[in-house]
């Protein structure tokens, strides 16, 4: 019986394993094994549920609801009732500018204001900055082609929009540097709108009008039919819920933890076709007819080195940034801040180590044991300040408390803190990323049964990883059952 080995037990690998299991349940005569080198499943999704009732997210705390793969997966798993929406009654996000929290104006889509009055009245931008942003209506479009996000925003909307809006959004949410980000790989819609409308503001307004026209009478524009959804959503017990549900649905004897692959060689299988010999760190070997690499690109590069040095080289060209999160639980009686909002983001030029702060207990239900507490989640590190992700625990906590005191006036000691570190965990889609993907696909296609999946390639979000893992597994199953498919990324 032919076998597929899935390397990596994060959301990508578990989604791949589930897709293979469904293929087997549908009659495919194949086998599989998932190999996770750490003691736990979930990868960057890591929820700590404490005995006294806190739900603490170490990794991502939510997902974007506009991508359907997570809802499709939950429907198959029978866990649709576990989704929760954000508390949009207090839907305010702030940007820290000159040591003051300034509300992000209503109507901002991606990085573009689309509503006139909120844009005119906001104190986030100066009047010269607003006038420069309005010039987007008149600036000619450039020739088609990729450029960095910073170059694009600076050219179309001006430096102040870059510094006060685009920069904190991509640094606080994606841990990225707009000066190196490939626009074609991250926000291709912005390039498309410039070419189609000659202005991204015109393009965003046109898109908003189209959603208004398409929405059923009385419905919120863009809202899907069925249960309520907000732009950002999570799960009742934290994002770990989706990991737990995938494991619950898996064949437990085929999901292995503490199972690290030391190296892989390409060999001939018993049937004469290409196979892969996986050398495990415990000295054992596993022979598989197909391999789904559901690990970060730099890990995959190490494993394919013996097979394809050129492929390994290109995989290593995808940078990975490091970050850290610290969650702090405070007794409400000890603090005066009202926490009316989702949190704030910090531009690079403000000189803070904190990149973003989520007011978790306000944004999400069920994150604190009772209303006697408030919980804050802070992100540090990222592409331009990775050293901050490795500060010693006591120094990291000291820095965060000092900066929260400066921004929010909190001088009380937290009742509890939780620190999580993520070294080389956030792939960076730098300029030339799409060209690298073409090279990766070309080199991987030369090796039948090799499939690459995960956040390093075509989307870093949880729905992107689910889609990537599922697609790779379905292609692997089709390949092993005789419906040959080229290796894809």
Locate the predicted segments by residue.
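Dinucleotide-binding Rossmann-like beta1-alpha1 core, especially the glycine-rich loop
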Residues: 51-140
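Mid-domain catalytic core of redox enzymes
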Residues: 257-376, 383-389, 402, 406-407
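Beta1/beta-strand and adjacent pyrophosphate-binding region of the FAD-binding site
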Residues: 1-12
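Active-site/ligand-binding neighborhood in enzyme catalytic cores
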Residues: 92, 129-273
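Conserved FAD/dinucleotide-binding core of flavoprotein oxidoreductases
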Residues: 139, 146, 151, 209-240, ...
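Conserved flavin/dinucleotide-binding core of flavoenzymes
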Residues: 105-107, 339-341, 356-489
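Conserved Rossmann-like nucleotide-cofactor binding loop
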Residues: 12, 40, 298
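Glycine-rich FAD pyrophosphate-binding loop
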Residues: 21-51
